[in-house]
Amino acid sequence: MKVNLPAFERAGVMVVGDVMLDRYWYGPTCRISPEAPVPVVKVNTVEERPGGAANVAMNIASLGANARLVGLTGIDDAARALSKTLAEVNVKCDFVSVPTHPTITKLRVLSRNQQLIRLDFEEGFEGVDPQPLHERINQALGSIGALVLSDYAKGALTSVQTMISLARQAGVPVLIDPKGTDFERYRGATLLTPNLSEFEAVAGKCKSEDELVERGMKLIADYDLSALLVTRSEQGMTLLQPNKAPLHMPTQAQEVYDVTGAGDTVIGVLAATLAAGNTLEEACYFANAAAGVVVGKLGTSTVSPIELENAVRGRADTGFGVMTEEELRQAVASARKRGEKVVMTNGVFDILHAGHVSYLANARKLGDRLIVAVNSDASTKRLKGESRPVNPLEQRMIVLGALESVDWVVSFEEDTPQRLIAGILPDLLVKGGDYKPEEIAGSEEVWANGGEVMVLNFEDGCSTTNIIKKIQTESEK
């Protein structure tokens, strides 16, 4: 099964927030100043990069979406540099010029890969009339599919509630990367995207997954949010929505060099994907993949459609990820030629929890490749009842495919995967629970082919049914 990229070329997104210019001066140091005990830097390279809300807009434009940027600037060289640089990457700027204030600029002096000093040129925009910002939002609402509010607490978003109200009245989702601990100002937003530190600063330290979910759901209720996405660095990200099961997506980063601007990439991809007509769950999947790409780059970076496509399709195209039966047979044949031991397991995996993750990791350790066969929606309904599955097949497979322990994910329509197993004939068939080996579907076929069958224990205290019951109980309070 292939995962298609969103139609970014049809997506329109407006970003409103704190715009700033990042300046970098590089050069060698070879002596100490006679005027003071400080190094003398002979500047030989100057770089200018859009920062803050401008970096979010660049991330949206880099995907091929229509990005509009609104913010407050001075009338100065920094504002002109921002406009020029952003125009070159197809970001449409509609700045509100404030003659009494400088454009927010952060100047960094670096030598030998060390930052020696940072100079900030800024005055708070808190007292500036927000009406011109409201007018620009109103003018764009008919042609955008999402509004991003990028808050760096520099004064552009003193009237957040008015902005949220304007967008919601027009049916446009509002995504906010929050700043500080006053989430009351974001009341009524469609989606907040705090990182774990920001989340815990408001909700309190979370000692377990259940506690994070419980406190996140309380924030959603307290501030009338439609959803909350907590980004958790190497632990991936967790999406929470009222009356829905938590969706946890493991990180896809292979190497982490720099997390600078990763939050801008996440909210930019989320907004562009939603504006293209995709679901929030799909938007989180693409944002998670993009974050895995951008943290592998040095400095503030963006993600191109090709890079995103490689991130979400690369595993399948090179023999990994979500597959059709035919693709799986070819991948298994190639693995056997390389002398690799193929392990196979199956299940519904409706709400992925710690027990599932631990079980799959243990199964993967038993061989070189792990296949996970997943019950289709119809098969799950017959097995678990009319209220299941909670998460549709495609989403269940996408999340499983993102796990480091899982190599291949395939679906089956029957009540058991016996036919599928007979066609694959893994070297080791694994099942979790209280089964006897001879009771496991496909065991006879695997034994007849000289393979092994094994039962692994599930982690105690983890149950999809219990999670669903807890969510239902909480929603009834």
From Swiss-Prot:
Binding residues for ATP: 195-198
Effect of residue 236 to E: In mutant SL1102; heptoseless LPS
Family annotation (PROSITE patterns): PFKB_KINASES_1
Annotated stretches, region: Cytidylyltransferase: 344-477
BP terms from Gene Ontology: ADP-L-glycero-beta-D-manno-heptose biosynthetic process; lipopolysaccharide core region biosynthetic process
Alphabetical list of SUPFAM superfamilies matching this protein: Nucleotidylyl transferase, Ribokinase-like
Region (Ribokinase): 1-318
GO cellular component terms listed in the entry, alphabetical order: cytosol
Keyword field: ATP-binding, Carbohydrate metabolism, Kinase, Lipopolysaccharide biosynthesis, Multifunctional enzyme, Nucleotide-binding, Nucleotidyltransferase, Transferase
Entry annotated with the keyword Secreted: no
Gene Ontology MF annotations: ATP binding; heptose 7-phosphate kinase activity; heptose-1-phosphate adenylyltransferase activity; phosphotransferase activity, alcohol group as acceptor
UniProt xrefs under Pfam families: CTP_transf_like (PF01467), PfkB (PF00294)
Record-listed E.C. numbers: 2.7.1.167, 2.7.7.70
Biological or metabolic pathway of the protein: Nucleotide-sugar biosynthesis; ADP-L-glycero-beta-D-manno-heptose biosynthesis; ADP-L-glycero-beta-D-manno-heptose from D-glycero-beta-D-manno-heptose 7-phosphate: step 1/4; Nucleotide-sugar biosynthesis; ADP-L-glycero-beta-D-manno-heptose biosynthesis; ADP-L-glycero-beta-D-manno-heptose from D-glycero-beta-D-manno-heptose 7-phosphate: step 3/4; Bacterial outer membrane biogenesis; LPS core biosynthesis
InterPro entries for this protein: Bifunc_HldE (IPR023030), Carboh/pur_kinase_PfkB_CS (IPR002173), Cyt_trans-like (IPR004821), PfkB_dom (IPR011611), RfaE_dom_I (IPR011913), RfaE_dom_II (IPR011914), Ribokinase-like (IPR029056), Rossmann-like_a/b/a_fold (IPR014729)
Family, similarity comment: In the N-terminal section; belongs to the carbohydrate kinase PfkB family. In the C-terminal section; belongs to the cytidylyltransferase family.
Function, as annotated: Catalyzes the ADP transfer from ATP to D-glycero-beta-D-manno-heptose 1-phosphate, yielding ADP-D-glycero-beta-D-manno-heptose.
Matches recorded under PANTHER family: BIFUNCTIONAL PROTEIN HLDE
Protein's name according to its UniProt entry: Bifunctional protein HldE
UniProt source species: Salmonella typhimurium (strain LT2 / SGSC1412 / ATCC 700720)
Lineage: Bacteria, Pseudomonadati, Pseudomonadota, Gammaproteobacteria, Enterobacterales
Gene of this entry: hldE
